[in-house]
């Protein structure tokens, strides 16, 4: 029986009977995979702690006829402190959902995995504004799944630009003043510059960025459009994020 080992984060889980459940793990080596954890629902199961949502650990699997089964696991960080604050829980659930909707099963993406785990640790240690961190992660997600935004050049005529008043969902970037605007939305120069800056900034340095609410709201709307357009599903957590932003 061949065993597969990888670090990973539990994205979500689903009960399949009174004892067993399926967990979806974003792994470093194999991308997102679904895994049967037999007996994980039992109170004394060795799998119980390692199969909770958000848990980051070392996992060992074996391949069955149709899917992986969990053989063993060791917790690196449970991230269960996320559960104690509603806003933090909602944002972290949203990040997990982004990974789930953007990644096909078995599609490795080590760069995105690194950004994902780093973002979790930054949130855990309260390093920076969680909303700005989420926008930065969305930009990394778009880049590492093939939808990188072109913000240094006009997306139509390819002329170099310092800023733009319009972002096109069709052309994945800014539109200069000489080109026709289509398939996107207007943006203020401040929000455009902030998007461009965040897109290039390492995730661990995002704490240095201080954005006002208007800019954060603009960025939220712009990136929500790209995410809704390019992935198979719209994250359900977006509804909760909207509630948080309205409070």
Swiss-Prot record:
GO terms for biological process: DNA recombination; double-strand break repair. InterPro entries: ARFGAP/RecO (IPR037278), DNA_rep/recomb_RecO_N (IPR022572), NA-bd_OB-fold (IPR012340), RecO (IPR003717), RecO_C (IPR042242). Keywords: DNA damage, DNA recombination, DNA repair. The keyword DNA repair applies. One of its GO terms (cellular component) is bacterial nucleoid. PANTHER family: DNA REPAIR PROTEIN RECO. Involved in DNA repair and RecF pathway recombination. Belongs to the RecO family. This is DNA repair protein RecO.
């Amino acid at each position: 029986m061949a065993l597969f080992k990888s670090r990973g984060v539990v994205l979500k889980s689903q009960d399949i009977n009174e004892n067993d459940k399926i967990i979806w793990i974003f792994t470093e080596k194999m991308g997102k995979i679904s895994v049967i954890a037999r007996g994980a629902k039992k109170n004394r199961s060795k799998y119980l702690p390692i199969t909770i949502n958000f848990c980051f650990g070392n996992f060992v699997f074996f391949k069955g006829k149709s899917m992986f089964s969990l053989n063993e696991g060791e917790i690196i960080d449970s991230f269960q402190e996320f559960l104690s604050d509603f806003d933090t829980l909602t944002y972290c659930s949203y990040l997990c959902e982004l990974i789930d909707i953007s990644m096909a099963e078995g599609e490795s993406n080590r760069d995105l995995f690194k950004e994902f785990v780093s973002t979790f640790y930054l949130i855990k240690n309260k390093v920076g504004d969680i909303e700005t961190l989420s926008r930065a992660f969305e930009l990394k997600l778009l880049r590492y799944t093939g939808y990188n935004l072109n913000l240094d050049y006009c997306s139509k005529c390819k002329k170099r630009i310092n800023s733009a008043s319009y972002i096109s969902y069709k052309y994945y970037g800014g539109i200069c003043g000489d080109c026709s605007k289509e398939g996107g939305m207007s943006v203020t120069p401040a929000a455009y510059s902030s998007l461009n800056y965040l897109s290039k900034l390492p995730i661990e340095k995002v704490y240095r960025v201080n954005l006002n609410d208007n800019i954060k709201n603009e960025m939220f709307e712009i990136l929500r459009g790209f995410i809704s357009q390019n992935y198979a599903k719209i994250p359900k957590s977006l509804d909760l994020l909207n509630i948080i932003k309205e409070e």
